[in-house]
Amino acid sequence: MTANTKMMGRLIAVLFLSREIAHREHLRTKSYSQHVALNTFYDEVIEIADSITEAYQGRYGIIDDIPMLDAPPKAPIDKVLEDQLALVEKLRYSAVDKTETSIQNLIDEAVALFLSTLYKLRNLS
């Protein structure tokens, strides 16, 4: 099984940035359904990021660098989260081999949270 600590640090950084963006939009929105959906997202994504990091570090050692990422250009929150999801999906197999199912399953939880949040943002009012 192989892993790339730099890529895992970046994947975790994307989750951290997604939380920050969602929290800020949660405080700005005038839509109750968006407010609730984003609250759930920012509460849960940080727990998932923590679980991924701890499992990864249990297998491969400490991630020395989780970079601070710049915020993406201003866009509707569903588009921003969709783009952040695409980054997670792009990084996941560079960060840890697909055969490392315990860690990949935790990443699946993050992906599912993004998808559920996108559904709520786009379809519930």
Enumerate the predicted regions with their spans:
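Helix-loop segments that flank and shape redox-cofactor active sites
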Residues: 17-40, 95-100
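Conserved alpha-helical segments that form or flank metal/cofactor-binding pockets of metalloenzymes
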Residues: 35-64
